[in-house]
Amino acid sequence: MSALLRPARWLLGAAAVPRLPLSLRLPAGGPGRLPSVVRVAAAGGRPAAGELLSQARLYAIVAEKKDLPEEPAPVRRSGSQFDWALMRLDNSVRRTGRITKGLLQKVFESTCRSGSPGSNQALLLLRSCGSLLPELSLAERTEFAHKIWDKLQQLGTVYDVSHYNALLKVYLQNEYRFSPTDFLAKMEGANIQPNRVTYQRLIAAYCSVGDIEGASKILGFMKTRDLPITEAVFSALVTGHARAGDMESAENILTVMKQAGIEPGPDTYLALLNAHAEKGDIDHVKQILEKVEKSDHYFMDRDFLQIIVSFSKAGYPQYVSEILEKITYERRSIPDAMNLILLLVTEKLEDTAFQVLLALPLARDETSSSFGSFFLRHCVTMDTPAEKLIDYCKRLRDAKVHSSSLQFTLHCALQANKTALAKAVMEALRDEGFPIRTHYFWPLLVGHQKTKNVQGIIDILKIMKEMGVDPDQETYINYVFPCFGSVQSARAALQENKCLPKSTTFAQAEVRNEAINGNLQNILSFLESNALPFSFNSLRGSLILGFRRSMNIDLWSKITELLYKDDRYCQKPPGPTEAVGYFLYNLIDSMSDSEVQAKEERLRQYFHQLREMNVKVSENIYKGICNLLDNYHVPELIKDVKVLVDREKIDSRKTSQFTSSDLESTLEKLKAEGHPVGDPLKQLILLLCSEENMQKALEVKAKYESDMVIGGYAALINLCCRHDNAEDALNLKQEFDRLDPSAVLDTAKYVALVKVLGKHGRVQDAINILKEMKEKDVVIKDAAVLSFFHILNGAALRGEIETVKQLHEAIVTLGLAKPSSNISFPLVTVHLEKDDLPAALEASIACHEKYKVLPRIHDVLCKLIEKGETDLIQKAMDFVSQEQGEMSMLYDLFFAFLQTGNYKEAKKIIETPGIRARPTRLQWFCDRCIANNQVETLEKLVELTEKLFECDRDQMYYNLLKLYKISGDWQRADAVWNKMQEENLIPRERTLRLLAGILKTSNQEVPFDVPELWFGDDRSSLSSSSPSAGDTVTEKMLLSDCRLKKSKDAYNIFLKAEKQDVVFSSEAYSTLVGLLLSKDDFTRAMHVKDFAETHIKGFTLNGAASSLLIIAQVRRDYLKVALETLKAALDLEQVPSELAVTRLIQALALQGDVKSIETIQKMVKGLDAIELSRMVFINNIALAQMKNNEIDAAIENIEHMLASENQTVEHQYFGLSYLFRKVIEEQMEPALEKLSIMSERLANQFALYKPVTDLFLQLVDSGKVDEARALLERCGAIAEQTSILSVFCLRTSQKPKKAPVLKTLLELIPELRENDRVYSCSMKSYVADKDVASAKALYEHLTAKNMKLDDLFLKRYASLLKDVGEPVPFTEPPESFGFYIKQLKEARENPS
């Protein structure tokens, strides 16, 4: 008793301490105690539910610590980083009541990277290392805390008493044994004074090991310092006496408390309950619980959970059930219970954890079928014995708590690479009839494959064999073969270990692997000796790759002959002719044009050898190969392929061609006899139009003009429009109007007129046609609106800004189309094509201000993100947020980050507090991903929206499965099934049917019952009849999908029409080809084009589609084909876009193809509609010559053009900037040196300063400042070329992030600062880049020179200063920027 009386006397001798409010009471912090709730209650009353805060709220008050007055708040530093860390940890605790090690590690590493972690950050990290980490063992938690302490101290973090107290709390929660005296000495050495909280926790530390004497010493310190003794101290003393074996003294502490004027509260009673629980004294526990129930006190669920911990850890799990009966299972206590379960599993008390798990109300919730995943995952992590874990799984399933517990446990075991456990679980699943699939073993194989662990691979293959699972080809090729020196050694090792399957799978994988490595001799030997039937389709892709990697044509031929003649490989149907034909087609199709050209002789030899081997192909496939060879610009090979055609199967049907000669003769005869010729004339005109014979049709019209009728004119107008003949089309329209002013063309012909006139720059004439459509009430349907879009889009792709604006304004103002987002797309596209992102954004914003639509904002955002235009992104987001709401802004940003692959940023956006699902927006992006075959993007969308509030997860997975169906990826589809089960998702019937269809198509077992359609019988009865109305496709459907940019749907309609032998109009196919090319879907576009060419006589792409085709061909390095496409378009009198022609010329220049550039120059000569500058040819021909190392010739040509009296380009317009820039970018140093010499010579000898000035400016722009400075010193006249320098400044100021370039230019030529245009451009660029220092320097320089500054300059400077919170040293001009821009423009245009 003496040990008890000593502290009691001190307590009685001290002044009576008023009872602390419960909100300020600290938890007892006894060993192993769960984090206690901060209790807020009226005296003696039970708190309201909303006033009870979990320890999660501690994170919300770390910065202020208002509820912890005994620990003075340290000075706050690194606010934004701290807020970020606080948010991540706080969100985790709010959501789950715990923190994972991974999350804490990330926050810790991020904090360390900040360089100077703040005091609050350190405190936050330390407090997270205790009971908030239930998934870590006690020792690991403490080790983590020490790691954080040491590292932050190294980084310069200054610790105060709050940090030492936090460390003490972690020690207590983690039951860490340490010396309190040494801890005090450590604080003293750091010159840190302990406070009341320090002493309280040191007392708790002594008491946790039953050291009452040590606790008494600390109490003595507190008494001498006149520190109040709180309930927390008494609670610790209860624990100390109990662990010292003196339960009587422990119980007497309550009496001592009352004598000290402190009424024992819940914490004290809980400490006493834990003391009895550690002794296994259930009777005393019950007595105390009854006593508390009769008093004004109460226990919360987490208090009962703590008692369960005490019983369990002391070895008395038999009493847990009696405590569980006391728990009310309030919703807010569920995270505490789950964390208790994790803690028990960590402490190897899985049985008790399982008992608590089954007692939770969620386990009895019939709507939940996957509760307990967290328990199973942690059991896997903590290496719970397989037998016990499998038993848990079965009991959870039988209790209908977790319907897929074994599958989920297998998933966790595979993730954790726990082979033995995975095997045991798979055996349990197999015994229950669950199919074990090959890809389940891939996570186990990949670890061994990375380390070349042959034995590990063999062990996994043995397990697969035991499980009755045969590896597929992917398994062997991706995971097994890479571990061996050769396939033969792999076969030998597997045979030795009896892992070689009896099926053909290994052999097929062997062939594929040898083909991939180009070992054709091994393939031939295998195919000759193979005794099993193989599918040619299973070999085709690998053989193509093998052929391309081997140049042995004899082996090519022998393998092809073997495949053609051996029944094992080309079974019927379709037979060897079709199978080998498709192989040849795919072989050539897989090559680029340059590869085909390089292998032309080898391919010719190959085809000749096949002919000698009597290998045949069908005529249809021959035509396809011809098209490929023609596109690859090697038509010479066509005759070599023709000899392979199977002549016996050629369709010998004769086709008769109806000519116009008979009609023309009849017409002349009727005219001579004086008979009416109206009808036959119209018939002849229509026939010539169908033959696309425009020249002849116009001649006939001229000859019989007096007899022409309305129908003939209409047909001729349409014909001229198709042939891009704007002049004759307009003349015919005028004659049409004179013939009958009231006559009306059909909508398609009006639209065609608008299109051809707009394309040829006759915008006003096109607008007049639009006005006539309005005046004559021409019916405008969806097809016409779609055509309007294509007209505008074609102009946009050509870069014709004014054309797009004027035509769009006319169409909308006249009411011919509503100002929808789609019809407004080209207003933005025209700027995107020019890569003018600021203008594109402004155009989109202007559309919203005028029409309340925001076209292409997604594409604009994606471009801005790719370019890193943070200011413009912020501007866009501010506008969207203001006009459409913050939620719309977040979704726009989320989708843009996803599209550009910035998944981390996308995750941050979608985890924004308060964001909820918007089904329409989500479905829009899903459809976009499906249409563009963006598998990874859609997968990330589904993954990131898992926790999104009100997100229809079934719909998300349904979209993902739709994409997998297109790609035929059954493995990923099967993984989706597992993922849906993990999420406890009940899929809709359509989702199940879609998944089942994917698995069945790939001959895989379906692991669930497939719902049957109630109308199945009706559907099957219709399947044998002709296509139903719902199956019939129309051109309107195709054009509608094209208008909506649904390229995938439009292409599917085309395929369906192809099967039904439905042929659309030329314009429909041109539209579809253009759409597919705009989506970079080159292969499908060519399929559509080839079909149209074979089904519509004289089919040609329209101008816009031809331009897109040229760009696509250039992008794929099909330069010869692109040149042919350009020639064909020009032969049809089409006007390709300036962009398409320029891209082709530039690509040819980089390849050194001077001849082709000169050919293009001749082809476009005189075509002013293309608006191609002569400098495009001059620059690119010179560049091509330099690429061919003909530098002297290139320079001589340039000098000759500049010095010649017959100048083709005036000196002031002879710009070589592009040439200089490409030479610098391509690092062509000899060429750059000689160009520099040439430029200086022209300047010094001929006073031609533009070349040297252009070179100087390109050196500045590319960052070669020293070279630019040296050039300026050698040629000082550069500084006098004010007009050239001003134009450069103007153009540069319009580009983002170019302020440093202008700054460098002004440093090199200081006198430019006083040029009003230059300093205005400089200020504009400084403001755009937020370069305050440079802006200030420029302003101060100009004011010092007493320069008169215009209002626009001052307005820009004032806006910059206000943005950064600095005072404006003058009166800010009051009007808008637009006002001053207009004012300055007028002043410069009218200098008077």
From Swiss-Prot:
It is found in: Mitochondrion; Nucleus; Nucleus, Nucleoplasm; Nucleus inner membrane. One of its GO terms (cellular component) is nucleoplasm. One of its GO terms (biological process) is regulation of mitochondrial translation. May play a role in RNA metabolism in both nuclei and mitochondria. In the nucleus binds to HNRPA1-associated poly(A) mRNAs and is part of nmRNP complexes at late stages of mRNA maturation which are possibly associated with nuclear mRNA export. Positively modulates nuclear export of mRNAs containing the EIF4E sensitivity element (4ESE) by binding simultaneously to both EIF4E and the 4ESE and acting as a platform for assembly for the RNA export complex. Also binds to exportin XPO1/CRM1 to engage the nuclear pore and traffic the bound mRNAs to the cytoplasm. The modification N6-acetyllysine is found at K151, K186, K291, K462, K749. GO terms for molecular function: beta-tubulin binding; mRNA 3'-UTR binding; RNA binding; single-stranded DNA binding; ubiquitin protein ligase binding. Residues 1-77 form a transit peptide. The gene is Lrpprc. This is Leucine-rich PPR motif-containing protein, mitochondrial. It holds the Pfam family PPR_3. Widely expressed. Expressed in liver, brain and a subset of small diameter sensory neurons in the dorsal root ganglion (at protein level). Component of mRNP complexes associated with HNRPA1. Component of the complex, at least composed of LRPPRC, BECN1 and BCL2; the interactions prevent BECN1 from forming an autophagy-inducing complex with PIK3C3. Interacts with CECR2, HEBP2, MAP1S, UXT, PPARGC1A and FOXO1. Interacts (via N-terminus) with EIF4E; the interaction promotes association of EIF4E with 4ESE-containing mRNAs. Interacts with exportin XPO1/CRM1; interacts both alone and in complex with EIF4E and 4ESE-containing mRNAs to form an EIF4E-dependent mRNA export complex. SUPFAM superfamilies: TPR-like (SSF48452). Induction: Induced by NGF in nociceptors. PROSITE patterns: PPR. PPR repeats lie at residues 125-159, 160-194, 195-229, 230-264, 265-299, 300-334, 402-436, 437-471, 677-708, 709-745, 746-783, 784-820, 821-856, 953-987, 1030-1064, 1065-1101, 1102-1136, 1137-1173, 1174-1208, 1315-1349. The modification Phosphoserine is found at S1025, S1026, S1028, S1137. Signal peptide: none annotated. Keywords: Acetylation, Autophagy, DNA-binding, Membrane, Mitochondrion, mRNA transport, Nucleus, Phosphoprotein, Repeat, RNA-binding, Transcription, Transcription regulation, Transit peptide, Transport. It comes from Rattus norvegicus. The keyword Transport applies.
